[in-house]
Amino acid sequence: MADLKTNLLGFTMNSPIIGASGTVGYGVEYEELADFSKIGGISGKGLTLHGQYGNKGERLWETPSGLINSIGLQNPGVQHFIDVELGEMLELKQKYGTVAIANLGGHSEEEYVEGAAMLSESGVDIVELNISCPNVKVGGMAYGVKAEAAGEVVRMLSLIHI
């Protein structure tokens, strides 16, 4: 088999395949179903500084070609992720070499900065910015729609060593 090792931001990955945020939980849920030695990284479920319940009502709609979802970034918050789920992701990294990626959303620049600062000291390998999730009704949508707003969040977070 071909060697698919690749480098992402200084991290050697088993392959360029990354379990996308929101599709594989925090990885451990799929450990028995996938050969993690062939997966480069896991991008955990989307996080916000403070936990959120997500959207009310119908959140999944099945269609003949797949699913439509409107989850609304339901998550336990950054601190809970650091205390609980990150340890599970880092165990996968130790066993299989999968890079641990945190997916961070926010409702303000300050929330992004505070969440990223906490994650930068947590042991997570990479922080992926969630600036375009269409499920967020306050703040998040605007960052992904306007280049200036997205650029400002990226600029502010580039000052934090992650």
Residue map of PLM features:
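Short beta-strands and strand-loop turn motifs
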Residues: 97-103, 129-135
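Catalytic cores of alpha/beta
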Residues: 30, 112-118
